[in-house]
Design a protein with these regions (language model features):
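Conserved, mostly hydrophobic/aromatic
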Residues: 3, 45, 66, 100, ...
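Glycine-rich, aromatic-flanked loop segments that form ligand/cofactor-binding clefts
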Residues: 101-137, 171
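Metal-dependent enolase-superfamily TIM-barrel catalytic cores that perform enediolate-based chemistry
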Residues: 126-240
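Shared catalytic-loop signature of beta/alpha-barrel
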Residues: 217, 228-245, 250-356
Length: 360
């Protein structure tokens, strides 16, 4: 069976009307959402698919630097594919190579008439615990109402993006806890706190907020500081106010080793589309197990990405692969965020969470 084509397909989903989100640092307007699907075809009409980073740069990398290694080759076991390419091209190719690897594994599984999970030790979970992710910038009361709406679907936790200013960010947590009760987890994706120019929060403010929100039972505080400031992360984690999460902005495996080796985080986040594919995630999760850290899948794309991440997560015990991010969009429920219909149109038969659990 010969590989005939490798296509990084870039797709765009314009919103019917732009959506504007005012926040402490200014205003964010969303005009469209983009996506990438990688398609690999063989001469026997077998096709492998994978989600990829929605980036023209990554698409160019796949076309120019990865495709020449595949065209005309016999379909092969891709277990060493990413590692071999990194050896040849350097760490900068890790993300793109990993995304292509997923499509190769899809093909390899189909060719061998088995689930991809069989190549990673088999399933240890038949469902993956999801958290509902939405919460683009809005008023404190609107955040609370959205949290309640998302948790009506059975999710054990809700993630949102705080950036209303320190006082209103704290008020938001208080109102959300009142809205969802004591048993639902609250996850704060605080990447905006250090991206607001002169209005960015200082380390002292981040430390104050971490202590202040702790009493409300926060599941984790995600990327509250500039991602490369390892010393600041280690200091904040050592205060033991709340669990600190990060990882989505790491560009190679060394970055994850550094996060854990320098004791920067309690929870490591990554996804197959950006972090070395299925083999990369397997290595990251193994690292988490050895460092006694929790792993949580990060997702912010189409419905295809959580399914592929779930393949990987199902091969690990829940004690390690604890959470799967499941974005909530307004085309499913008008009470949340904004619409992204392309997400579901790509994989209309993809499994969806049932009472917060994604069945496989």
């Amino acid at each position: 069976m010969i590989i005939q084509s490798v296509e990084p397909l870039l797709l765009s989903c314009p919103l019917a009307e732009p959506v504007t989100f005012p926040f402490f640092g200014g205003c964010r307007t969303i005009f469209k959402r983009d996506a990438m699907v990688i398609r690999i075809t063989t001469n026997e009409d077998l096709v492998g698919y994978a989600p990829g980073p929605a980036s023209e740069e990554v698409a160019t990398t796949i076309i120019e630097k990865i495709t020449p290694f595949l065209l005309g080759e016999e379909l092969f076991n891709p277990e060493n594919f990413v590692e071999d390419l990194v050896d040849k091209k350097g760490d900068s190719i890790w993300s793109a190579a990993g995304a292509v690897e997923v499509a190769l594994y899809d093909l390899w599984g189909k060719a061998n008439k088995c689930s991809v999970t069989e190549f990673f030790g088999g399933r240890k979970q038949e469902t993956i615990c999801c958290y509902g992710s939405a919460g683009m910038y809005q008023s404190a009361q609107a955040y609370a109402e959205e949290a309640a709406a998302v948790c009506e679907l059975g999710f054990e936790a809700y993630k949102y993006r705080p950036a209303l200013g320190p006082e209103d960010d704290l008020k938001t947590v208080e109102l959300m806890r009142e809205a969802v009760g004591p048993d639902v987890g609250l996850c704060l994706d605080a990447h905006a706190w250090w991206r607001m120019g002169a209005k960015s929060y200082s380390s002292a403010i981040v430390e104050f907020l971490s202590e202040a929100i702790a009493m409300h039972g926060i599941t984790w505080l995600e990327e509250p500081l500039p991602v490369k400031d390892r010393d600041a992360y280690a200091k904040l984690k050592a205060m033991h106010y709340v669990n600190i999460a990060a990882g989505e902005h790491e560009h190679d495996f060394l970055g994850f080793r550094t996060l854990l080796g320098r004791d920067c985080v309690d929870i490591v986040q990554a996804d197959v589309s950006h972090h070395g594919g299925l083999s990369g995630i397997s290595k990251i999760i193994d690292l988490c197990e050895r460092r006694f850290a929790t792993f949580a899948f990060h997702n912010w794309g189409t419905a295809l990405a959580p399914v592929v991440d779930a393949w990987s997560g199902s091969c690990c015990p829940r004690e390690t692969a604890r959470w799967l991010e499941y974005p909530q969009y307004a085309h499913r429920d008008t009470r949340v965020m904004y619409p992204f219909p392309l997400s579901d149109e790509l994989v209309p038969e993809a499994p969806v969470p049932v009472k917060g659990e994604l069945p496989l």
